[in-house]
């Protein structure tokens, strides 16, 4: 809040030295004159100008100035009315307002013929203030310093520079399936060899048929024609069987690789720390686990097989073409360099487009996952059209990228196809002349043309193989980045925890969230919780109450200082075994799809049925008996089939079944009705008499009173107060007393200040004024909210 020394910039003639109260306010309100006024009008003005009075009283010696403004407001207004005073005074109110701005327009009044009405005088200024919204505070500047080192790159760690290293690593994924892939490759050689023998056989058949017509021959390769055709049919059948074996082996291997990839990546994702999930969107992770793994699996199985088949067929085709005619082969060789160059640039373009498509598919998955997961909220605000439009906009982006990919593919394949057709035409022209000259036979020309078609098809196959391989490299680079990412807090390293009993001590703990390192949550936080006690942690919203639970669970590590349990630093403990000793019930409980029994047993997977029933009874889950299937009732996704209170009681049972050494209750009864809360609290009270240490993050007075010790967190990230309820309540000026008064008042005082005309949201909590003689001017509770006539 700006102080009284800023006055000279808007009040000419005033200096920063102390000014007598009457002179100061006489300068501020030159049109105020001393005539009698009604008490109600005076109180109306007191409400109107209370924001400034409180601000000035906080910046100066309060009593003289409060007396001065009381004297001025006790007087009547001269014939010019309030409107002559108010504009200048409004600037004073704005001067002393805090950085927080009210979202509601400021209410200004003027007098017209004795009737107070709302003027249009300051509408432009009010509109400008509303458009500005909230002024940024110093904390906002700190929050702007974002650390996203844990965020995965959109194109993977290698980005657009992915090359041979990524290709080799991609192929190594298939190493466990090497034997099956070798068998598939053997089948590939058999089927490709048989396929490539067909053109040669057809050429010989044509030459034999021509010779039989002219010379009467009826044998082929030393076999009669019927025997030759029978043998050829058997060979083709063998080729089909080999092709069948190749396809089915590769499909099975591909599915196995995809399943292994998904399992490994999901496990790697699940062990990441909280910083990782703070920085990455769930939709992008789902996209990597689903579509990216499919692309990679296809790339190293089916696509690899197609590429090898194209390579074998192409090599055999070019070799047999050279055997038939070197002259015709040299003509065909002229086509290879431009096709190879075009295939190279085509593959690069497809790789970049594939990355963009996968990135946008991740965004699309994120939109669908978030919106469908919160569909009731969208429907409650009638936001269906907005969300469908948002989804369609992303679909349109993917469509445009797909259209661009189609255009590039069509251009490449059509141009290479046209070049191939022109080459065939040239071969027919040259080959026809060679047949006429007797250099080659008609059968040899036919075989050569068929080998040309096979070789051309192989070239197309290699181009497709390269483009699909680049897609796989793009997807694999995204998977490798996730696979290589090591969590900052490993859940499996450290000393295993046999027991988490003992005092809990925070020693000089300083902490900021990793994604917002410049915004400190705690500064030299120190407190100790004795073993077996019930401690309530209270404080303002955003003060770090739930952060204490996150640090104890080792979701985050302190920036400075240390946290001890039983005298041992938790950073040296195995996080997974420590979490097994801690039970937590959050304010917004999360249930998983499955039965009630499965959700309760989630805290202890090997729990017996009797243990599940006992935990449910402790948590007052009698509502289970109202379901036809009892404990086997399906709760639906995220517990959608249950009410909020029912979900919370199941969450309490899930924590109790662990019999944890440390129980953290983060507003655990916030969703319960009064009767259920009483029953659950009774159960918790009986439970807490044991050796369990309980930390209650509380706002409700009933929870706070039940605690042995109360720790009050201050806005500066330190402990403001600590003690029992009786001790802290006995301190009238203590932080706990003020916090409780604020909560129990329901915010009425601040609401009154926020609704006061011409008073932006200010920090004052009391605005009683005093007259010159020291008597208080009390608030007139009968003043209506609408402006009244000033007599």
Swiss-Prot record:
Residues where ATP binds: 539-546
Glycosylation site list: 147, 303, 352, 421, 508, 692
Biased composition (Polar residues): 754-769
Inducing stimuli: Expression is up-regulated during biofilm growth. Expression is also induced upon amphotericin B treatment. Expression is down-regulated by tetrandrine and posaconazole in a synergistic manner. Expression is increased in clinical azole-resistant isolates.
Biased composition annotated in UniProt, kind: Acidic residues: 770-779
Cellular-component GO terms for this entry: mitochondrial inner membrane; plasma membrane
Gene Ontology MF term list: ABC-type oligopeptide transporter activity; ATP binding; ATP hydrolysis activity
Protein's membrane topology: Multi-pass membrane protein
Stretches the record annotates as Disordered: 754-791
UniProt keyword ATP-binding, yes or no: yes
Keywords per UniProt: ATP-binding, Cell membrane, Glycoprotein, Membrane, Nucleotide-binding, Transmembrane, Transmembrane helix, Transport
Function: Pleiotropic ABC efflux transporter that may be involved in A.fumigatus adaptation to azoles.
Recorded family membership: Belongs to the ABC transporter superfamily. ABCB family. Mitochondrial peptide exporter (TC 3.A.1.212) subfamily.
Protein name as catalogued: ABC multidrug transporter mdr2
């Amino acid at each position: 809040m700006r102080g009284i020394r800023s006055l000279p910039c808007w009040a000419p003639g005033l200096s920063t030295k102390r000014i007598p109260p009457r002179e100061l306010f006489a300068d501020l309100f030159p049109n105020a004159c001393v005539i009698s006024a009604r008490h109600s009008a005076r109180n109306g003005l007191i409400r109107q100008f209370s924001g400034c009075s409180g601000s000035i009283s906080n910046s100066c010696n309060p009593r003289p100035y409060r007396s001065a403004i009381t004297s001025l407001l006790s007087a009547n207004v001269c014939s010019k009315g309030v409107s002559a005073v108010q504009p200048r005074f409004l600037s004073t109110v704005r001067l002393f307002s805090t950085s927080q701005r009210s979202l509601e327009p400021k209410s200004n009044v003027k007098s017209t013929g004795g009737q107070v009405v709302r003027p249009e005088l300051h509408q432009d200024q009010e509109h400008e203030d509303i458009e500005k919204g909230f002024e940024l505070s110093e904390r906002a500047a700190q929050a702007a310093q974002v650390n996203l080192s844990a965020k995965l790159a959109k194109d993977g760690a290698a980005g657009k520079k992915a090359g041979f290293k990524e290709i080799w690593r991609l192929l190594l994924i298939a190493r466990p399936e090497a034997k099956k892939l070798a068998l598939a490759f053997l089948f590939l050689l058999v089927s490709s060899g048989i396929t490539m023998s067909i053109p040669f056989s057809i050429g010989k058949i044509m030459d034999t048929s021509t010779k039989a017509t002219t010379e009467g021959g009826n044998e082929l390769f030393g076999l009669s024609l019927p025997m030759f055709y029978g043998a050829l049919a058997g060979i083709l059948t063998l080729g089909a069987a080999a092709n069948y074996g190749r396809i089915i082996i590769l499909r099975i291997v591909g599915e196995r690789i995809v399943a292994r990839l998904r399992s490994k990546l999901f496990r790697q994702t699940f062990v990441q720390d909280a910083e990782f999930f703070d920085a990455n969107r769930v939709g992008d992770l789902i996209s990597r686990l689903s579509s990216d793994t499919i692309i990679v699996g296809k790339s190293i199985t089916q696509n690899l097989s197609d590429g090898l088949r194209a390579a074998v067929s192409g090599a055999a085709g070019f070799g047999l073409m050279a055997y038939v005619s070197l002259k015709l082969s040299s003509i065909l060789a002229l086509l290879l360099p431009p096709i190879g160059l075009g295939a190279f640039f085509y593959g690069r373009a497809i790789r970049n487009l594939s990355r963009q498509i996968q990135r946008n598919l991740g965004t699309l998955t994120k939109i669908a996952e978030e919106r469908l997961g919160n569909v009731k909220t969208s429907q409650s605000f009638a936001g269906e059209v907005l969300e469908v439009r948002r989804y369609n906009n992303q679909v349109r982006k993917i469509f445009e990228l797909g259209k661009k990919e189609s255009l590039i593919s069509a251009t490449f394949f059509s141009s290479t196809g046209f070049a191939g057709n022109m080459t065939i035409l040239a071969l027919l022209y040259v080959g026809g002349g060679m047949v006429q000259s007797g250099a080659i036979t008609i059968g040899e020309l036919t075989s050569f043309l068929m080998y040309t078609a096979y070789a051309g098809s192989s070239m197309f196959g290699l181009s497709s193989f390269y483009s699909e391989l680049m897609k796989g490299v793009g997807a694999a680079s995204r998977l490798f980045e996730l696979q290589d990412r090591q969590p900052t807090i490993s859940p499996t390293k450290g000393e295993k925890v046999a027991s988490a009993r003992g005092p809990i001590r925070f020693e000089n703990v300083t902490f900021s969230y990793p994604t917002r390192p410049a915004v400190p949550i705690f500064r030299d936080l120190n407190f100790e919780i004795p073993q077996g006690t019930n401690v309530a942690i209270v404080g303002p919203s955003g003060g770090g109450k739930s952060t204490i639970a996150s640090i104890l669970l080792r979701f985050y590590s302190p920036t400075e200082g240390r946290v001890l349990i039983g005298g041992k630093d938790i950073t040296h403990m195995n996080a997974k075994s420590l979490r097994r000793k801690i039970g937590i019930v959050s304010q917004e409980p999360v249930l998983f799809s499955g039965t009630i029994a499965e959700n309760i047993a989630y805290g202890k997977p090997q729990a017996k049925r009797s243990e599940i029933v006992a935990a449910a009874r402790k948590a007052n889950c009698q509502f289970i008996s109202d379901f036809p299937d009892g404990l086997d009732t399906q709760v639906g996704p995220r517990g959608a089939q249950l009410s909020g209170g029912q979900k919370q009681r199941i969450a309490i049972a899930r924590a109790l079944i662990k019999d944890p050494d440390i129980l953290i209750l983060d507003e655990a009864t916030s969703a319960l009705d009064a009767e259920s809360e009483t029953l659950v609290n009774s159960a918790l009270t009986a439970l807490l008499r044991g050796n369990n240490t309980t930390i209650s993050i509380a706002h409700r007075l009933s929870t706070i009173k039940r605690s042995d010790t109360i720790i009050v967190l201050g806005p500066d990230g330190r402990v403001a107060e600590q003690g029992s309820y009786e001790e802290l309540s006995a301190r009238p000026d203590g932080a706990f007393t003020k916090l409780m008064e604020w909560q129990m008042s329901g915010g009425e005082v601040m609401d009154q200040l926020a609704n006061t005309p011409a008073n932006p949201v200010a920090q004052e909590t009391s605005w009683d004024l005093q007259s010159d003689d020291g008597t208080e001017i009390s608030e007139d509770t009968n003043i209506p909210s609408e402006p009244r006539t000033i007599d």
